[in-house]
Every structure is written in C-alpha cells, then in structure tokens.
Regions:
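Helix-turn-helix/homeodomain-like alpha-helical modules used for DNA recognition
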Residues: 84-131, 135
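Conserved hydrophobic/aromatic packing and binding residues within compact polymer-binding modules
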Residues: 20, 34-35, 45-48, 74, ...
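Recognition helix of helix-turn-helix/homeodomain-like DNA-binding domains
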Residues: 39-54, 79, 110-125
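Primarily N-terminal secretory
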Residues: 1-5, 13, 37, 56, ...
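A short, Lys/Arg-rich alpha-helix, primarily the initiator
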Residues: 2-26, 76-96
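Short basic helix-loop element that most often maps to the first helix and adjoining turn
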Residues: 18-37, 62, 88-103, 132
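DNA major-groove recognition helix of helix-turn-helix/homeodomain DNA-binding modules
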Residues: 58-73, 127-140
Length: 140
C-alpha cells in the first residue's frame, strides 16, 4: 500500500488563496463544505483560491476562524490596512503631510465627508477607495 502526501510545503505558499486551499484540504473540507460555513457559493471559494478575486476582509476573518489559522495568512495589503486599524493610519499619514481632512481627501479624489467618516471609524473604505488613496499616498 502506497500513500501519497498531497500537501505542498508551507514555504511554497505565498498568497492568501494558496493558504486558504492548503488549510481547507488539510482540514478535509470540500469547497462546498467551506462555502456553506461561510455562507457563500462554492464557485466563490474557488475564485479566492485561484486568485481570480481577493478575499474580502470580513470573509478572511471568518475563514481564519473556520480553518483555525492566523488571519494574517489570509490578508492581502487591503485587509492588513483595515485591521491595522485604518483610522490611525489615515490620521497619521494626513498629519505627516500637514493637511486637513478636506485637502487630504480632495487630493486623492475622495469626497471629504466620506473621508471624515473613514477617519472617525464610522465607515470603512472599500478596496477600490483604498487603492485610490494608496496611489496618491503610497505609505498608506
């Protein structure tokens, strides 16, 4: 009887989707089973694993809990920003540039009222808005 070890070495993994697939398989879960636990469709699980689209922050947090792994393995730069906490990062970068909220937001093409909600923590930036901010302020 021959057994084949199907799991790649952890050192070979580099993306959140690869970690997701590795630990899903390690836990003996099918894409359908994991999808049901996350309340999403199996095709979405495959999309995350195959890097067709990024894992949203809330899904990454839930997924880490389900797979019993550190959230950081499933976080891309946007998720790291959101968990940092992003309110402190935004405030610090804005102050470093010596700008008020309105000027900081307008220089990135963002509504000042929306930006104020981000910095106060009453609203979270979308991935698209994060990328827009990062294009102007790379240190974010």
């Amino acid at each position: 009887m021959h057994l084949r070890f199907i799991f790649e070495a952890l050192s070979d993994l580099s993306t959140p989707g690869e970690y997701m697939r590795y630990y899903r398989q390690l836990r003996g879960l099918t894409t359908r089973q994991l999808a049901e636990k996350l309340n999403i469709v199996p095709a979405t699980v495959l999309g995350y694993e195959q890097r067709r689209f990024p894992i949203p922050y809330d899904i990454a947090v839930l997924l880490a809990k389900e797979l019993q792994i550190p959230e950081s393995l499933l976080f891309d730069d946007f998720c790291i920003f959101i968990s940092a906490p992003y309110t402190e990062i935004l405030h610090t970068v804005r102050k470093r540039h010596g700008l008020n909220q309105g000027d900081f937001a307008e220089s990135a093409g963002i509504s000042p009222s929306i930006y104020a909600k981000w910095e106060s923590g009453s609203r979270r930036p979308s991935r698209k808005m994060y990328q827009q901010l990062k294009a102007i302020y790379p240190e974010i």
